[in-house]
């Protein structure tokens, strides 16, 4: 049986470390900390990539961009999204919509949500209303609640491109 839709979900987390900004959803935002990561550590775009790859059973971000590969040191995660999008398109699929949740106490994501949505919609060449970015806290519980790091979840609906 063949379906014209698939769902993918992704999750990413990074610990806070030295620095004065974060990259979230392709948007640079001032923050009291950076993140410990091989690339730019954009948890939003990393979770999005994992969701896109997962929808077509293409592995995960670590398979395509291993931290052991020096090419990805400090890399802009937008490159990862573009690569994943091309993998989907090469197989006849596109992202129909993306729903992303950032989990953190700080920074406050709300003021940056529109810019993040615009950046992601642009990377995927989809409508702005097909990208949702929202945030929640963990009510001071766990590593995000103690402000030790940041996490993101993403869900995507993939659609088969009509021939």
Swiss-Prot record:
Q: How is the cofactor bound?
A: Binds 1 divalent metal cation per subunit.
UniProtKB keywords: Isoprene biosynthesis, Lyase, Metal-binding
Q: Which SUPFAM superfamilies has this protein been placed in?
A: IpsF-like
Q: Name one Pfam family in it.
A: YgbB
Q: Name one GO biological process term.
A: terpenoid biosynthetic process
Give the superkingdom in one word. Answer: Bacteria
Molecular function in Gene Ontology: 2-C-methyl-D-erythritol 2,4-cyclodiphosphate synthase activity; metal ion binding
According to UniProt, this protein's pathway is: Isoprenoid biosynthesis; isopentenyl diphosphate biosynthesis via DXP pathway; isopentenyl diphosphate from 1-deoxy-D-xylulose 5-phosphate: step 4/6
Look up the coiled coil feature and give its residue ranges. Answer: none
Provide the family line: Belongs to the IspF family.
Physiological role: Involved in the biosynthesis of isopentenyl diphosphate (IPP) and dimethylallyl diphosphate (DMAPP), two major building blocks of isoprenoid compounds. Catalyzes the conversion of 4-diphosphocytidyl-2-C-methyl-D-erythritol 2-phosphate (CDP-ME2P) to 2-C-methyl-D-erythritol 2,4-cyclodiphosphate (ME-CPP) with a corresponding release of cytidine 5-monophosphate (CMP).
Q: How does it assemble?
A: Homotrimer.
Q: What is this protein called?
A: 2-C-methyl-D-erythritol 2,4-cyclodiphosphate synthase
Which organism was this protein described from?
Xanthomonas campestris pv. campestris (strain ATCC 33913 / DSM 3586 / NCPPB 528 / LMG 568 / P 25)
Quote the gene name from the UniProt entry.
ispF
